[in-house]
């Protein structure tokens, strides 16, 4: 098959390398930065440069750019896409993308499926892309139609051929609701946590807890700002819930209320055990 990869950063670049390493498919790649596209070709990450003249030859089109850019790309190229092609985006929010792209696909006769590979690094760019980034990872899919079992089986088989160990099928709204907690809130908290005045003198005083909590503080502010704003309703709910929870801990400590503090700590510990086991 011919696989197009649009956007050759960490996610897209790793997809192209995974396809090259794990399959015999040909990769047609494109990045808005022409030098990255050329480097990926010289590096062996892609076979050909994706363009208007060959996009119709692609069986799968994997789009790995920001949400708004995903919609713009699909609007611009929709008439050139093969009617039998499957287009999958890799954005971190799904409702904003799927609401537009389902309609674009329907009008132009191809299939669009929302996607979100649950893997990444705290670095960005093609130079950090690796063929094994997705080994053992989960891929979330948000199709417009879950009745086409044959198509979902084919897409799942293709995705797993790249190293993913599991595929989760859900709706765009459910994805956004849960991802606000599991990913977006974690990035907000991590990024805010390192703004403590003590952060600059942490060396020699920090170990696993500090590393765990600050791992995702270093981020791409342009991408994450867009993701947060596109999912603001769900993210604000999670932020408010966290603020309320922190207020309970703060109040117990301020009032020297050890019993309440112990209860809060035990509740959190028990909650962790119940959701992980």
Predicted feature locations:
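N-terminal Rossmann-like NAD(P) cofactor-binding module of classical short-chain dehydrogenase/reductase
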Residues: 61-62, 88
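Interdomain hinge/lid region at the active-site interface
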Residues: 201-268
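Rossmann-like NAD(P)(H) cofactor-binding subdomain of soluble oxidoreductases
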Residues: 75-127
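Alpha-helix C-terminal capping/helix-to-coil transition sites in glycosyltransferase folds
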Residues: 56-57, 136
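NAD(P)+-binding Rossmann beta1-loop-alpha1 motif at the extreme N-terminus of oxidoreductases
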Residues: 1-52, 60
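Internal alpha-helical scaffold of NAD(P)-dependent oxidoreductase catalytic cores
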Residues: 131-215
